[in-house]
Design a protein with these regions (language model features):
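Glycine-rich phosphate/adenosyl-contacting loop at the front of the ribokinase-like
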Residues: 1-73, 113-115
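Conserved N-terminal subdomain of the carbohydrate kinase-like
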Residues: 52-128
């Protein structure tokens, strides 16, 4: 069986979720990031997948690791960064249902990642 190694962003999608009784917008916090989503989808199809990336050593970073672990994605290549926060993506929904994103990621942990030997090993172990 082929092994996939996904590299890139793992973040929180802050998605609109209605309006409160006081008329304020409500939001739902969902795991996101295209590479991580691909890894989860392939595991669901029976493919062995690992994820390489970096999140903040914060509430959201640990939440995201737990999600990937629960979905059976190998997270040995996921780093926690004490200096930079986990990236947030604000999801904007148009009336026609199209999504657009505003990223809160200046110096976000996912874009401050540097290649290391562990990443190289995980990539070498993978077929894709």
């Amino acid at each position: 069986m082929k092994k996939l190694c996904a590299f890139g962003e793992l973040l929180i999608d802050v998605t609109p979720y209605g309006v409160s009784d006081k008329g304020y917008p409500l939001s739902e916090f969902n795991p996101g990031g295209a590479p991580a989503n691909v890894a989860v989808a392939l595991v669901n199809l029976g493919v062995e997948a690992s994820f390489i990336g970096q999140v903040g050593d914060d509430h959201w970073g640990h939440f995201l690791k737990n999600v990937l672990d629960d979905k059976r994605v190998d997270t040995q290549g996921l780093l926690f960064n004490k200096k930079y926060l986990t990236t947030l993506a604000m999801v904007n929904l148009a009336e026609n249902g199209e999504r657009s994103f505003s990223f809160y990621r200046q110096n976000g942990a996912d874009v401050m990642i540097e290649m290391n030997d562990l990443f190289k090993l995980k990539i070498d172990e993978s077929d894709i």
